[in-house]
UniProtKB/Swiss-Prot annotation:
EC number annotated for this UniProt entry: 2.1.1.33
Positions with a binding annotation for substrate: K206, D236
Identification of the protein by name: tRNA (guanine-N(7)-)-methyltransferase
Pathway(s) the chain acts in: tRNA modification; N(7)-methylguanine-tRNA biosynthesis
GO CC terms in record: tRNA methyltransferase complex
CDD domains found in the cross-reference section: AdoMet_MTases
Family matches, as Pfam families: Methyltransf_4
InterPro entries registered for this protein in UniProt: SAM-dependent_MTases_sf (IPR029063), tRNA_(Gua-N-7)_MeTrfase_Trmb (IPR003358), tRNA_methyltr_TrmB_bact (IPR055361)
Annotated keywords: Methyltransferase, S-adenosyl-L-methionine, Transferase, tRNA processing
Keyword Signal: no
Binding of S-adenosyl-L-methionine, residues: E128, E153, D180
Amino acid sequence: MPHLHIAEFKEVEIPSSKDGVSFNFIAKNSSHQEEKLISITVDEDEFFLLAIDENSKKLLKSDKLTRPPSIFNVHKALLSYASATCMNIISSNVPQNQKNIHLREVKALKDINYFATTFPKKEKICIEVGFGSGRHLLHQAQNNPNILYIGIEIHTPSIEQLLKQISIKNIENILVLNYDARLFMELVPSNKIDKIYVHFPVPWDKKPHRRVISTAFIEEARRILNIGGTLELRTDSENYYAYSYETFIAFEKTTLHINKNRDIAITSKYEDRWKRMQKNFYDVTMINSEESPELSLEGDFNFSHVKLNTQEVINLYKKTQKFDSGFINFERSYFLDDGAMLRVSMGNFDKPEHLYVIVKENKAYYYPKTPLRSKSNLMAHKLLNGVLCE
């Protein structure tokens, strides 16, 4: 995580700008005075910097929830803020002079809104969930230039490594997304995808609810796969294989191909290591045979007239509201100069979204972006609207 270790935190003039970075407003945590969020705009990216101003720790870093795809814009924002306030930097992991030309402007890296607004219309599309080193994804893309590959990963170093290779090799048929694949699949149009690769997912033996393969995931895979499309699981965990097989076979109608220790054209560096250790590998490939109805969701993320005053909004901190398939949890509350802001987790129990909601002048809106359009998020928004506005 990019950060600056500073001698003393100083507030920047609001609103102001420096070196192409705009400082929009500051949100102050209502329960932890040492924590502040600074709203930043760099190019088309809008996000928060997080300031921690404790006696033993004074840091300025990017806010995890709103961190943009471009790490360069985060670096630029941190250094510009420090320069604008003349802060003394004790130590830093932010490069001040060196710039990786392979990562500075990468068209392959996309935000979730890119897919939510207009999903790619390529004739053949494949998805890889958790691409790791990217070796398999790069191999597939280079050998199938007419197919669009969407690589989904939440590990930032893996993303940066893949983007560098895409730039060096000048590959134009890969799109990269830093997002939860389970949520992403909820916005994919029906019958659109040729293949879904899930290679060596984390087994999560102690937290099975976090596993990628689940009944809900398979249902979404069946919906978005075209007829003859496949979901391919590859794992070295016998427990995960057994669990996945039982989950697949529980469907009333399904076609599966099972392989053990199958050789494939390209392997990851971890797979090479595990082969030397003589570990077993299991493949479960589900073949879709049904056409699904078009995706249809009703509702929006607009708020009605807010009836709570600023202090009542602040007092929602730590409260939770539940509904049949999800919840809303008010994780943080913040004071603004002209209102309040909430950090909420909402949606499905197993795959919630974490968002900010600004409330001022009897109006409310999500910041810096609205939730992903999904059934559980629309239901959660309806409940949140009721809390704030009814």
